[in-house]
């Protein structure tokens, strides 16, 4: 599974509720197809650094995406968030 370059993928979250701001950056990339089914998001730690927010805030944004069926998450060494795609 291909992992997009994490350097320019997202910008720091600075407005609204931080988890919503993160969600609002990831969601359109999934809907537009920029992030394709099978792509992996960077690990939580990297996402937290990119968005300049804590891991729990990132986790909440990922939970919102998961509830919509856009990503799957797993724990452990082969875990992380994987794009499911748009149904």
Segments from the language model and where they lie:
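Short linear motifs at protein or domain termini
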Residues: 1-87
């Amino acid at each position: 599974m291909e992992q997009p370059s994490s350097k320019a993928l997202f910008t720091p979250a600075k407005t609204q509720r931080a988890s919503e701001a993160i969600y609002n950056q990831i969601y359109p990339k999934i809907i537009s197809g920029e992030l394709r089914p099978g792509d992996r998001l960077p690990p939580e730690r990297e996402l937290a650094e990119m968005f300049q927010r804590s891991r729990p805030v990132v986790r909440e944004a990922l939970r919102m995406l998961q509830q919509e069926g856009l990503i799957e998450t797993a724990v452990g060494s082969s875990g992380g968030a994987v794009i499911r795609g748009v149904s």
